Amino acid sequence: MVNGSPRVSEKTKQKVLAVMKENDYTPNVFARGLGLDSMKTVGIICPNIADSYMAKAVAYLESSLHSYGYDCILGCSGFGQEEKQNYVNMLLSKRIDTLVLVGSTYAGNGKDEYDTDYIREAAEKTPVFMINGRVRGDNLYCACADDCQATYE
């Protein structure tokens, strides 16, 4: 009923909503997600939120996602390979609907495939969006800025 089932009459919906309000009931987001294909949650990882570019990018992402009814879980992974992988795995365990990686550090060093394998593995479970980084693979979506041109302008 709380998930908006069309099989529940309007009269019953109103009664249930009144009882919920009267008792200050808040639905459990995890229990709600059990019956749905979506948790309406996006995981966002950046290396360091203290960086002004990262902070602005994350603030814009979060604001935009909230306008579409999505909650966000933010993680600041640092730059170490193991830490980045741990954050990705932690967010995947939270049943996120998609993963957004902010910053070129997630694209690896360009020499070793292994350092981005964890991203391709994550993309097998949920869509992965990379901002200012590029990794090739299925279910991976990348947007890159031309930093040199931006500096010139």
Q: What is the meaning of each model-derived region?
A:
Residues 1-39:
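N-terminal helix-turn-helix DNA-binding module of bacterial transcription factors
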Residues 36-153:
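Alpha-helical recognition/docking segments in bacterial nutrient-uptake
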